[in-house]
């Protein structure tokens, strides 16, 4: 890449993105720092259990301050891009709607797919930057044989973020740099220290950025209250897969597939949530074996390594961020739908989550489990 070109660095205020900026600056690139302001932590801080205003991850004022301080240290221009309205529309509201209907959403993927990369590239273009660079642990390069950009798993498997990036387009991949793709997290912290960044020991972000305490149930209650609404009545029956009513629950949003605790039913053997039937307000429970399945369907597919799925393909399929990819066969069942058949049964396949498909290190594509 021509070092006279300008790169916009997405700066979250964390170690990873700050190190990316320091690395590229040291290599002689022209840089501009950009922070996406997505959520005002003060909005719900008055609600019980949400802590002091401004406390949080990724969206807090502390993180903006840290990003600005790094930009000043590196002597690069820095801008904050306010996208709170779009974030609420495209990420927060779908998150709330999904939980209330019995699905378990992934807001980080929604944010990457529908907002973050799109807006970063738009802003970069407006300020004269040809590419963006982020602190994600992933790799990308152009495959001359297929004529397509590829997204690949990083060197540090423990930090692999490709699961959340399956929605990236060819245009986005062609204009994005992932400088940390060949590094491990300890190496990144050491690089940050060597570059004189005071935040080299800053803890990693763990929570959903707009739910800093991790309690999504309190968030739902607080957010709906702010909107002048209240939690809808989604209470209903606890039933077995055969239809036997074994109890009642106070709201379908309190459960997710695979959950064992908090069912309120005493039996001779452990029970787990097998399925959530939002239309009937039923929580289906059963034993652990009933959580196992060999098949799933996914919709709203995004293909990366291939332009489309012309015939059945052998892949490794990943059904949640911490899930070890498992051998499976995929085949199209509709214009935007695939059937994934695993060699071995997988536990707790959850509607609302993503399934991401791999050919070795290469992300073939991904979609939303239905």
Swiss-Prot record:
Record-marked site positions (Interaction with tRNA):
136, 353
User: Which GO terms label this protein's molecular function in UniProt?
Assistant: ATP binding; tRNA binding; tRNA-uridine 2-sulfurtransferase activity
> What is the enzyme's main class?
transferase
Q: Where is this region: Interaction with tRNA?
A: 159-161
Q: Which CDD domains match?
A: MnmA_TRMU-like
Pfam families, sorted:
tRNA_Me_trans, tRNA_Me_trans_C, tRNA_Me_trans_M
Q: Name one GO cellular component term.
A: cytoplasm
Chemical reaction(s) catalysed: S-sulfanyl-L-cysteinyl-[protein] + uridine(34) in tRNA + AH2 + ATP = 2-thiouridine(34) in tRNA + L-cysteinyl-[protein] + A + AMP + diphosphate + H(+)
User: Which residues does the Swiss-Prot or TrEMBL record annotate as the active site?
Assistant: 111 (nucleophile), 209 (cysteine persulfide intermediate)
Keywords of the record: ATP-binding, Cytoplasm, Disulfide bond, Nucleotide-binding, RNA-binding, Transferase, tRNA processing, tRNA-binding
Give the UniProt subcellular location, in the record's own words: Cytoplasm
Biological processes, Gene Ontology terms: tRNA wobble position uridine thiolation
Which family does the entry's similarity section mention? Belongs to the MnmA/TRMU family.
Q: What is this protein called?
A: tRNA-specific 2-thiouridylase MnmA
The protein's organism comes out as Koribacter versatilis (strain Ellin345)
